[in-house]
Amino acid sequence: MDLYNLDFQTLLILCLAFALGGLVKGATGAGSPVIAIPVLAVFIDAKLAVALMAIPNLFSNLIQIHQYKDTKKSPKLAFNLAVFGTLGCLFGTIFFVSTSTRTIELVVALVTILYVISSITGNSVKLSMQIAKSVAPAIGIVGGIVQGTCGVSAPIALGFLNSLQISRNEFIFTISCFFGAMAGIQIISLLALNFVDWQLFLIAAFSMVPLSLGMPLGNRLTKRLSKKSFERLILLFLIILSTNIILSP
């Protein structure tokens, strides 16, 4: 699909995808790519979907880092995840640029399914903060590779942070540092590898508008709808999207 000559209907769908990503980000802090990229991959080239998400992903995480900066209790954990996440993301992005679109589509679908399964089964493993800080570099590298490859590292990041006894605010701050750092290096890498041109860059920048509108709505939604009900709706939606991506020719 020619991204620069979209019809109005497709453009509207893309805006809704980013708005929905912002909604999920504002409600759970889980990361807008986990919903936006699978939606985008249904309608446009999956590699373009990943590239488009990088800039608004950086933007949304910087907002939440600023919003929750006063809640940090373990800055070392956030720092280690961010630093090693960028290292892994660099290698993942190199693989992303060199591989086929269909491979990226399947990776997006499989990682999304992994996210759904991990959300349904829950996480019975509990880690102390001391152990978490020790394994954070490894988690960061693995999460970074996955992020660079398909733009969705939520299953790894959420599984790790959910094993810790931390507040929602500290959770959002830590995961935003992780996602934000990876988004930054992903953008730089894509530009350096000549995968992103300035037209795509501007379209991605414009996508920050619907995403930023969705974030406060997501925050408000959690006050009206139970978190469990909201998550069930999102998981059902992700199952449908992933199945569609896998079965598409």
Model-derived segments and spans:
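Hydrophobic residues within alpha-helical transmembrane segments
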Residues: 16, 20, 55-62, 79, ...
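Structural signature of hydrophobic alpha-helical transmembrane segments
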Residues: 10-11, 41-58, 102-112, 141-151, ...
